[in-house]
């Protein structure tokens, strides 16, 4: 495997880039908790390897999950140095957020309205994220163990800039011979 353009082979990023996986999910959990007003332990990531037990029907809570990463079509290559260049692109992160329990409307609408508060967006910006758009809050009650559980869902699209560094060397000199007259 090559990690520089001075040798043949595949190039992988030499920097990690932004948060993904559990780190990103932890950041999103703190964000949803902080903006909605739900306690930290009541906001849970969906689709984890270890599933949390379901909340009691009379308890309020929220599950969220990242449904898609959507990138812009054309990345830009910037900051070329002798040793590397940076790939810049913008990425959208589409999240499904579900509020459960007897006060799910209250927490869902508090979260929805909190998305418009500039201080909340500034705090989210510390993690390189911003709210791009959100859907309406939609009722989707679930029948679990022959009991209706109140549930309201919304989709949030976050946006961020992704920067990755690659070992693409700059061309400093190239030996050239001209033939002819």
Where does each model-flagged region fall?
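Small/polar-rich, solvent-exposed N-terminal microdomains that initiate assembly or binding
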Residues: 1-81, 172, 176-181
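Short, conserved charged micro-motifs
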Residues: 23, 104-109
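Aromatic/basic-lined ligand-recognition segments
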Residues: 54-56, 137-139, 164-168
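Short beta-strand/turn micro-motifs at beta-sheet edges
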Residues: 80-86, 143-144
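Oligomerization/assembly interface segments of phage tail-like spikes and tubes
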Residues: 87-102, 111, 150-160
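Acidic-leaning, charged glycine-interspersed low-complexity segments
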Residues: 106, 116-163
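A short secondary-structure junction signal
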Residues: 107-110, 167-169
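Acidic, proline/glycine-rich low-complexity IDRs
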Residues: 153-181
